[in-house]
Amino acid sequence: MIYQPPAGARDVLPLEVAQKRWIEQRLQQTFHRWSYQQIITPTLERLETLMAGGAIQPETVIQFWDAEEGLLGLRPELTASIARAAVTRMAGAIYPQRLYYSANIFRRSPGMELSSQQEFFQTGVELLGGSGLADGEILLLLQDCLHSLGLPEWHVVLGEAGLTRSLLSNFPLELQPHIRQAIARLDRVALTELPSDLRQPALDLLDLRGEPASVLQRLAQLDLKPEQRQIVHHLKTLLELVGDRFPLTLDLSLIQTFDYYTGIVFDVIATGEREQRLLGEGGRYDQLLARYHPGGESLPGIGFALNLEDLHQVLLPTGQLPQQMPTSQWLIVPVHPEAIAAAFSYAEKLRGQPESQELRVEMALEWLSPEATREYARCRQITYIAWIEADGSPQIEAVKG
């Protein structure tokens, strides 16, 4: 039998780990500069927690049955778990709370092949207790994150879940799910099959995307309700704040997979020569925390998640990521069995020096001839060999290439 990971899972080997840690560390440094603090939530949660009151479909969750706990699941995203943690564990916290995470998620897509990837790694933020001004902070933080990675080409697609949902409410209730699904899939053909009096309004909603000024102009021509105009005004203010800091498309047909968003939603997309790649997504969810509170009390929230695998693929061709594993600077070799304890002590001394935080020291674990030891050190690109006598005295040798 050949032992392999189960379908949908994969091993991540040391060089790829180092490359992804490079990405994570730069993102975390950016989060720290913006005063975000790390939170860790369980990989395994109760299924009702993960479903977020019906906003997340159960078929996307890898599920387990436990005799005592009932239905459990592996988290398909982090926002619901963090919302639950904020309500149940942070009752006395002072808001706003700025939180970030770096974690794996597990997600099934309906109709996906069994061999399709089901484990992913995400790094993201949640800003809890922030009003509309938090929208601007999150978009500017997103920009800072991507700049910290030296990402070559990217743009943001910005939507407004509350406004899109409100515009959909003009259609007959029984047709709203069909129209919503068609718009989410950009399925113009499905919309042309609607009754004649609904066809053009649905197509108009689908076409509310493009250059922001143009979309806002088209919105101004619609007969909007006061609350809809208020949302449009907020969008204008947000777009003025962002300005031309990064390329942005306004798209009111943007509908996210998870249905807990109530305000702005956005995708960040890499726009390379070969293909477009979704790097992350986010949005505002002002009612989510109420679903976990016994009294239904809520706090506004907004956040985003960046997909580590996709960032990794986009950054690989740039040459920024580590191209090889760090090598040891020292190889410590006891010259005979009586020198083993002294060799370990010498290695410990090297590692304990104040300036040795990044120093890599390894012990020779096999009894090799001096020439075989030197060849090993050359192959591993080790800088120095320390030959240790029983009394602890070292003979230092620089490894010649």
UniProtKB/Swiss-Prot annotation:
One of its GO terms (cellular component) is cytoplasm. GO terms for biological process: histidyl-tRNA aminoacylation; L-histidine biosynthetic process. Belongs to the class-II aminoacyl-tRNA synthetase family. HisZ subfamily. Keywords: Amino-acid biosynthesis, Cytoplasm, Histidine biosynthesis. GO terms for molecular function: histidine-tRNA ligase activity. This function is generally fulfilled by the C-terminal part of HisG, which is missing in some bacteria such as this one. Heteromultimer composed of HisG and HisZ subunits. Pathway: Amino-acid biosynthesis; L-histidine biosynthesis; L-histidine from 5-phospho-alpha-D-ribose 1-diphosphate: step 1/9. The keyword Amino-acid biosynthesis applies. This is ATP phosphoribosyltransferase regulatory subunit. The keyword Amino-acid biosynthesis applies. It is found in: Cytoplasm.
